[in-house]
Amino acid sequence: MEGRVSSVGSPHSFLNAPVLFRGPVEPLVFLANFALVLQGPLTTQYLWHRFSTELGYNGTRHRENCGNQSADPLMKEVETLTSHWTLYMNVGGFLVGLFWSTLLGAWSDRVGRRPLLVLASLGLLLQAVVSIFVVQLELHVGFFVLGRALCALLGDFNGLLAASFASVADVSSNHSRTFRMALLEACIGVAGTLASLLGGHWLRAQGYANPFWLALALLIVMALYAAFCFGETVKEPKSTRLFTLRHHRSIARLYVVPAPEKSRMHLALYSLAIFVVVTVHFGAQDILTLYELSAPLCWDSKLIGYGSAAQHLPYLTSLLGLRLLQFCLADTWVAEIGLAFNILGMVVFAFATITPLMFTGYGLLFLSLVTTPVIRAKLSKLVSESEQGALFSAVACVNSLAMLMASGIFNSIYPATLNFMKGFPFLLGAGLLFIPAILIGVLEKVNPHPEFQQFPQSP
């Protein structure tokens, strides 16, 4: 069974509330990412059309006339504004989440995973409410930044992922952990694919508001599930203060205090590897919608939806590929294969000027996401059972920093390179991916069979 009911003595009343059933964590991740992906491309398109209206840009979106718009200065200004406001939203979320995600993740090692899951669910719900107000009332787009910051204050999606991965580590065996991590990431992908397909068609039919209302409804269901249906996986939750430096010190100890079961070098270098992988992933994701909206592709909302769905399919295909490749290859070499396909996909995106070539790039990414579950599993096995929350909150911090770097690098380079090579950020991403490929290979050669921490089998 995935979870266990919280014990008496938990610090908050909802911890002591009886659960309706001992549910797994995967539905929470599915609902959260469905809601986020439903909102993400729509927010980018809303910003694009909002700035187009304000600047008086009326360029046709029909592909047959698209080539004539490539030199339009108004279109370039719309692209630049959209890119910059995407950056502002990500910076706002990072600056708040850097402190809170790490604090809450380490806190969950003592009080249990459920409090963090509930708080993160409420934060995502609050962000959706703010987005609805912006779209319905045509408020200043700066309120998107406010909603993002409020979400980060309660843990954000990174906090939810930290608690979710720690929950999986709590109950998985050493042998099954890599696949369980990949299964959790597959929930992200399936949700993203379905939300992308729905969002593109729905936008064409009914505009921006209704998809945001659906996201709000899903997040309400998610918050209720976290509070009353998720089965706690920490064996003995205990009451503890939230506002104490002890939680942050527990994260620092992971990397600076020697222990028999872990190598500080492996922890640091695997963290660097996942940092680079996440930076490239989210950097490319940040500019892909904008890249597809503008010349020479000029995709409409329907094609944007198909592209976003294709972007999330690797979560599922990577899960299947990981399961098959594990029969004949070590996890390390599965990760290397994933990085190779990721590099190929980035290179194709860089030179894609027609729709079939863009979808070829998406197709080459079918194994691109086997790398992150492998690294997460290796990190999880390097620390003790009581440090999983601290570890994954550290990984959440790495993710937040990577997302900020991704926004800063890709959203700054993209408008700066429009005049000489629009796809240059994708080439940069392909080059950066050689760093984790080298790190993972070197760590395997230096210590091919590290003494990972062995957890007891879950009942």
From Swiss-Prot:
Keywords: Acetylation, Cell membrane, Cytoplasm, Disulfide bond, Endosome, Folate-binding, Glycoprotein, Membrane, Phosphoprotein, Symport, Transmembrane, Transmembrane helix, Transport. Glycans are attached at N58, N68. The keyword Glycoprotein applies. One of its GO terms (biological process) is folic acid transport. The modification N-acetylmethionine is found at M1. GO terms for cellular component: apical plasma membrane; basolateral plasma membrane; brush border membrane; cytoplasm; endosome membrane; plasma membrane. This is Proton-coupled folate transporter.
